[in-house]
Amino acid sequence: MHELHQIIDETIAALEDIKRSGVTHVEVSSETLDRLSSAGVSPVVLRDNGTGETPALLEIAPIEARADACTMCPELVRCRHNVVFGVGNARAELMFIGEAPGADEDAQGEPFVGRAGQLLTKIIQAMGCQREDVYIANVLKCRPPENRTPLPEEVANCLPYLLAQIELIKPKVIVALGATALRALLDVQLGITKMRGNWYNFRDIPIMPTFHPAYLLRNPAAKKEVWQDMQTVLAKLGREAPRRAKSEE
């Protein structure tokens, strides 16, 4: 196992031991907070579920810091401005996973903030949620040059970070946005057109594949299919789309 992957696994194991011991918070010095801030660690919205569990931010922050310092893909390291780790509710029931950051995401350090991201936000709102209610991430944490498709070795290098996010967030449902996200998790070769709209399973978590918002910008007619997929997701979560969204189908 690569040294970085081993470090991530050991970090997660140590945090799980701390949680099992009954620790509910960790004192952090102002100097440590300053270092985390300068490292580009993005804020994560927490939801207190009243169970006394260790806050998810304390679990995710070390993994995010490792990703921020990662140099495993030299070409991506040379081109990136920011590592784009993830954003949202670290106790979310619903997690969206895309392909990789684009130019806007690389500049701002947050996933899905460009045109495709704005469309994703509208989809989330149509589902009766806000971005702060869900968790959003990509397979790759760094932007590929010219927004090219991620290389297999880049996906392999970055996948441990995504797996750690899934393990710590423990979503009830994952939406895979596009073929890259789906193939990274399920190791399948079928296209997204054939697989979308059907349930698959990843480590006992249901996965719904659907078209990437960037595809919808090029093919607006496919929005109807994506909305059908999102209604299926809501049903899996035991929810319904808001009445206004239903009327606009």
Show where each model-derived region lies.
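A polyanion-binding, active-site-adjacent surface
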Residues: 2, 17, 24-249
